[in-house]
């Protein structure tokens, strides 16, 4: 990424009310928390912990009056953990990605399948874009009703590279799904690549928002 491109990303992040350090700190803390998991935890626990703690960090810091003015809002409706901009202009959720997270020369998709509610949110992103409305149409107050479903949703995508162990991240706005996977984006803002988080975060990282979880049952001797 060139210097001018990096400057454009920084400017766009500022418009969205966030900065790279927030996301870097969130992922670092999530990694530290996930590393506490052991072989006695459920097989997917490290991935779930990493996902949950990343979203928790964003929520705790963006809703803290000592760190943010005005504060953001938070909701876990439909099992989709979201922080909502004070104006109600957009929301952000952290999910794992796959492909080329952070590399605009490569395609990227959500790592894990998404359910009916997420599919509707992605579709609403496209409708909002086509309507010609700006991303920053202010509201005096966000009521978590229909407004939450219609506001643009951004993904903080993260991915661990299996070859060198680096953790890459980007902030992107989804616009289309293929099957249960988000694979097309209106905007992609590369953030950074960081050192190995020290664990496999490529496992299931969130409950399906349709409410049905699948568990593999193995017979032991």
Residue ranges and their predicted role:
Residues 1-49:
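Interdomain/boundary linker segments immediately adjacent to catalytic/signaling cores
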Residues 63-94:
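A short acidic/basic microdomain associated with nuclease active sites
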Residues 140-221:
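Glycine-rich, aromatic-bearing surface loops/beta-hairpins
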